Amino acid sequence: MATKTSVVDRLRSRIGAASPPISATVEAGHLKRFAEAIGDPNPRWLNEAPPTYLVALVSVSIHLAEAEEYGKGWLNGGNRFEYMEPVMAGDHITATGKIADVYEKTGSSGTLLFIIFETGYVNQHGRTVARVRGTAIRR
């Protein structure tokens, strides 16, 4: 089994490396069902994507086998969404992610591994429509 230090070093070596792009088309029916699922009846969401929709539309996978060796259990440390323009039904969205930072923090329950992700979302016109920055925590 790898040491925690070697796991952190391997993850840090991947900072900035882009994931393979993944694409999907925003469908009006999916927007409606997503709005129903989050309990938001605003008719705006019949044609425009609600704020967290993109994460459900195209989930970027950054393989983190190294982190599995660090410990057990994942925690979601939160996400920050930044929108540059609305995402509408019919838009074709391509997402690419990367590891932005990796660090450890020691607290009362022990040492935790923090992995910061950034994902960019581009529409069919080549314009960046949104960015998401998230934190995954491994115990």
Regions inferred by a protein language model and the residue ranges of each:
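Hot-dog-fold acyl-thioester-processing enzymes
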Residues: 1-78
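Aromatic side chains
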Residues: 34, 45, 53, 81-83, ...
